[in-house]
Each structure stands twice: as C-alpha cells, then as structure tokens.
Amino acid sequence: MSLKEKTQSLFANAFGYPATHTIQAPGRVNLIGEHTDYNDGFVLPCAIDYQTVISCAPRDDRKVRVMAADYENQLDEFSLDAPIVAHENYQWANYVRGVVKHLQLRNNSFGGVDMVISGNVPQGAGLSSSASLEVAVGTVLQQLYHLPLDGAQIALNGQEAENQFVGCNCGIMDQLISALGKKDHALLIDCRSLGTKAVSMPKGVAVVIINSNFKRTLVGSEYNTRREQCETGARFFQQPALRDVTIEEFNAVAHELDPIVAKHVRHILTENARTVEAASALEQGDLKRMGELMAESHASMRDDFEITVPQIDTLVEIVKAVIGDKGGVRMTGGGFGGCIVALIPEELVPAVQQAVAEQYEAKTGIKETFYVCKPSQGAGQC
C-alpha cells in the first residue's frame, strides 16, 4: 500500500469522511557544498523519492486535528484562535504546530484542517525528514486555502518554525530543496539570495545514499564551533561572510590566522568554488569531473574542515574502489557520522552494494543501510 493510500484510508476511518487532497514533500541529499550554507555560499542538493505524505481536508471551523500514522496514530488537536504553544508529549506535533503558528504570522487567511501524516524519509540519517514534514504542512494549508505563497516562502516558514518553535538552528537548504525540487534535476542554491538553478542529472545515474550508522555524538558542539570559526574568519577579512572572500585573498594572509581557523576557512572557500563548478559538470554530463570534485570535497572535509570519522572514510574508500572514475562519492551532511552520497552508473549499483556489504561491517563492526534514490519533484499534490 502506498503512503497516499495508507493516509487516505486512515483519514476516512479516523474522521468519518474522505480527504479532499493528498500532498507530498520529499527528503533530500546534498551532492556537494558542505557547511557552505551558513556562510552565504552555494549548495547542490536534490530531492529524493522518500517523502512525507499528508491526506487532508479543510474544516468549516477553526480547529486543527492531526493524526501521526507513524506514531501509533497519536492525535493532536489545537485551535487557531488560541495561542499555539509546544505540545508537552509529542515532539512530532511541534513541527506541525510551529509551521501553523508561523504561517499565521505571514498570512492568517486560513481556517481549520484535518490531516493524517505518514512518511518514509529515514529519521536521524541526515536526509531532512523534519524539513519534509514542515514543507508538507505548509503546502497543505497553501493548497487548501489558496494562500498566495510560493515555494520559497513555504520553505522560509518551515525554517522559522524549526529555528524558533522547535529550537533547532538549521540553514535554509533543506526546506528549499523539499519545496522546489525538480524531477531528474539537482538544484544549485545561492544561500544568500535564495536564487535557484535547476541542473539536469545525467541519464542512467543512480543517487546512492549509504548510512554509516555510526552514532553521531560530537555533531552539535563541533557544528557550533565550526560556525563560530567561520564567522571569525569573515571578520578577519572584514566581510559579511566567507562567501565574499576569494582564495587569492586568503592565501596572501593565511599565515596570520590561527592555523586551525585557517584550515577551516580554506575548506569553505574551496568548497564554494567546487560546488559552482560541479553544477556545470553535472549539466554537461561530465561524471568524471563531478567525481573528481566530490573526491576533493571529501578530502577537504577530512583534512581541512576535520568533520569526517574513520567509519565514513572507510565507506567512501570501499565505494571509490568499485566505481573508479565512473562516478563520485563523498560524505554528506553535518559530519561526525551520518551518510555518504554517491553518483553511480545504474549498472554498477549491485557491485557497489555487494562490496559494501562484504567489507564495511567486517572493517568497522557496524552494518550499513543502503538507499538507491531518484532525483524527485518537490512538494505538491500526489
């Protein structure tokens, strides 16, 4: 049974009438451009065919009823006429409440709604299950009540909800790609202007995501440290963000910076340049060059930005040994564990899967999780 069928059937059973709409919003993977988003730089993600699906209908009153199919059909109810505060017990409900609350601040011309939510974006894998939920809820209200909001506004609303209501400090990339993703394309995003450019993906290439299943422990504290060091670097160059510093300017005075800060700044500058070039390589179908850029990105994250772990490096090496120069592989996400992403000709996927199954657990003691994805369409009706 598809997520659409599941949520529609649950909706009819729970609420006693049929849903009028079913909306989906996808998760995402970032192909290249790591830690560049909060430096006003460039990222190159694609939406994936794992999504949050919501069957829904408008109500003729001011009540919101939400059922979470993936959490034993827990039900949350709240009113649009009372202050929206955090739910004491259901963390999932706070993503919904946060989106609704922040949407009221943007455009309060919507009424009540019934929703049943289900999703298959793996949680805790860095594939943006939370952003896909936020964008799905925003799209539900936009579609049901014909709100004059575009995908970028729905994305910004989701980011605000996560930052201010849920209390997690994320960039804009995850929500933006979920809202604006395009089938068979990646999206080059300028994180300063929020401008986007669709980049066609070569035919016959699979997007493979492999979760190392190494439990991330350092990610919060180390992420914040990296962010502060990048801000220190921007101040040193008297620029608003590292996006405004050229590699030539950096090389001329790198010796004056703290050596650790200098290495971390260098990663951001080189990664921005790689990301822009990667968009061109992909568009031209040059998988060999894309692979080189992904390899350089991984080396930079490992040696300059220092955010990989041995388990991730091992996974990358296993995949690289199989694909050679026919594709690319690198760590993706915040670092200190999580996933790797690989662009692989479809005919090589079984060989990669076999090599990883045979070697990764033997070398690390951890069993990986393997996902084969397609670049998918952003949020909308399904």
From Swiss-Prot:
One GO BP: galactose metabolic process
Binding site for ATP: 124-130
Main location: cytoplasm
Residues reported in the UniProt entry to bind substrate: 34-37, 223
Catalysed transformations (reactions): alpha-D-galactose + ATP = alpha-D-galactose 1-phosphate + ADP + H(+)
Positions contributing to Mg(2+) binding: 130, 162
PROSITE patterns tied to this protein: GALACTOKINASE, GHMP_KINASES_ATP
Role description: Catalyzes the transfer of the gamma-phosphate of ATP to D-galactose to form alpha-D-galactose-1-phosphate (Gal-1-P).
NCBIfam families on file: gal_kin, PRK05101.1
Name the UniProt record assigns to this protein: Galactokinase
Biological source species: Shigella dysenteriae serotype 1 (strain Sd197)
Gene name in the database record: galK
